[in-house]
Amino acid sequence: LFRSQEEIRREVIALQDMGHKRLALEAGEHPSLNPIEYILESIQTIYSIKHKNGAIRRVNVNIAATTVENYRRLKEAGIGTYILFQETYHKDNYEALHPTGPKSNYAYHTEAMDRAMEGGIDDVGIGVLFGLNTYRYDFIGLLMHAEHLEAKFGVGPHTISVPRICSADDIDAEDFPNAISDEIFSKIVAVIRIAVPYTGMIISTRESQESRKKVLELGISQISGGSRTSVGGYAETELPDHNSAQFDVSDTRTLDEVVNWLLELGYIPSFCTACYREGRTGDRFMSLVKSGQIANCCGPNALMTLKEYLEDYASEDTRQKGLELILKETERIPNPKIREIAIQNLKAIAAGQRDFRF
């Protein structure tokens, strides 16, 4: 819990100075310490901060299951994706893990995405914590949840996250008999990508560099970089007390090191937030993704946002690698008109302008 909006402001500026354009706002479940008004004020604070060339263009929110009315208020505040992990779909195991407190109602938690959709949020992110139960059970539950949302609302999950049990304060992964191996983890990622081809798949810094490299090849499309899981961890010059850490970070590289690594692997590191701001969400996003038409936007937007990062935040080595990739990938844009506009926008970014998008 941040004690003031000024503390949040310092964290946001630190993230902007790293080069981030989006963030996930995560809050606890205490009804009086984390009321919806506090969340809404924090979102407003985050969007208001413009530091140098930095700006957070998309705020995703991960808070406890709440009411349709509160989801409506989050939508009105301009959030990107509402994220909530099921943890496990196995009802008995879930209730054993949460015998009391706000999360103890299995049905209320499981139906949160329905209420979010009813409240107007059409980009939702789901996930389970693999290792709490047998992976096959939770894997099927995850796919059934995605299928249910698409059948009922015409919109499947915008993102699926695949965290697995890892060590943290007072938690030893070896104490969980259902913890999954690297091989099974890779198989889960691959099959989700085949079964839910339209979704963004997220992997965090829980996973090591080696693990992240492997699953990038299998369908992961979003990764974090430079993450810190302690309250105030970005603004502090030294890491704060690890007692506030949500989990231990395995990949401790800076954002620039991650971007450099992705460039070496031949990927285009994208900082794009265009779909959210152009209204390409929900069923509109689904239709564009399923038809493949979204590629007309994704490629050029990725190159333009990468160019912004290279101009404002990158090390010289990363900058040179990025410029070489942009030059190569720009020529591969299939639509001549879009390619021409992208080239002009890239030149404008080099001259100091920002925030172009298709």
Mark where each language-model region is.
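Radical SAM enzyme core and accessory elements
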Residues: 213, 218-221, 227-358
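Short low-complexity, flexible loop/linker segments enriched in glycine and/or proline
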Residues: 37-41, 97-101, 138-142, 218, ...
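Conserved C-terminal portion of the radical SAM core fold
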Residues: 27, 81, 107-171, 181-210, ...
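Mobile, glycine- and charge-enriched loop segments
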Residues: 43-47, 51-62, 75, 80, ...
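Generic secondary-structure signature for well-ordered alpha-helical cores
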Residues: 17, 48-51, 118, 148-151, ...
